[in-house]
Amino acid sequence: MQIVDRSNLEASLKLALSPENNPKRNFVQSVEIIVTFKEVDMKKGDLKLREIVVLPKPPEKTKKVLVVPTIQQLEYAKKAEPNTILTKEELQKLQGNKRAIKKIARQNDWFLIAPDSMALVGRILGPALGPRGKFPTPLPNTADISEYILRFKRSTLVKTKDQPQTQVFIGTESQQIADLAENALAVLNVIESKGYAQKVRNIYVKTTMGKVVKVELR
């Protein structure tokens, strides 16, 4: 079951990005899709989403990735140009430096960690990541992790918490409507693949500071 028609999605995105709903700001705004659900009891765990989606049309400004690689992975990590690279030793030196830890947690979107550093990251960065809804993701054991890092630079997160809805980054206002629609459909396809298509109540799109625009469902 396709949740929305692409034409309806593109029409709503065009409206959301119009001057009447999206007054010009002095920064490039993000574009988000909001999906609300019906007939679910969050306390009973009826709706659980935490899915990483690679955007087919990523924005020019990609997500910021922090990497804690092994020694063997270090040069490959540098090749992918993540926002932050920390060696295990540099990570250990952050212990107790709350200001630096909070800055790292704030300035990065994804945290890709070598398996042998996961416990250390949980202990040192965990208290700053948790309240921000961020979490460490293990790196594969292969040496060449450059493609893996690049994948996360192009990714967004579909997640639910305590409310029956998810609000997901799908790009920026500088992108083409067709590209934003393709990214939105990738998000909706994941929701559908998890069996929640029939539970969708409403879908909306908006920019960071703009008005919410409803998308007509099928």
Swiss-Prot record:
Keyword terms of this UniProt record: Repressor, Ribonucleoprotein, Ribosomal protein, RNA-binding, rRNA-binding, Translation regulation, tRNA-binding
One biological process term in Gene Ontology: regulation of translation
PROSITE patterns (alphabetical): RIBOSOMAL_L1
UniProt-recorded Gene Ontology molecular function terms: rRNA binding; structural constituent of ribosome; tRNA binding
TM region(s), chain numbering: none
InterPro entries: Ribosomal_uL1, Ribosomal_uL1-like, Ribosomal_uL1/biogenesis, Ribosomal_uL1_3-a/b-sand, Ribosomal_uL1_arc, Ribosomal_uL1_CS
Pfam families for the chain: Ribosomal_L1 (PF00687)
Top-level taxonomic group: Archaea
GO CC annotation, single: large ribosomal subunit
Subunit-structure text: Part of the 50S ribosomal subunit.
Function: Probably involved in E site tRNA release. Binds directly to 23S rRNA.
Family: Belongs to the universal ribosomal protein uL1 family.
HAMAP family listed in its UniProt record: Ribosomal_uL1_A
Record protein name field: Large ribosomal subunit protein uL1
Organism: Saccharolobus solfataricus (strain ATCC 35092 / DSM 1617 / JCM 11322 / P2)
Gene label: rpl1
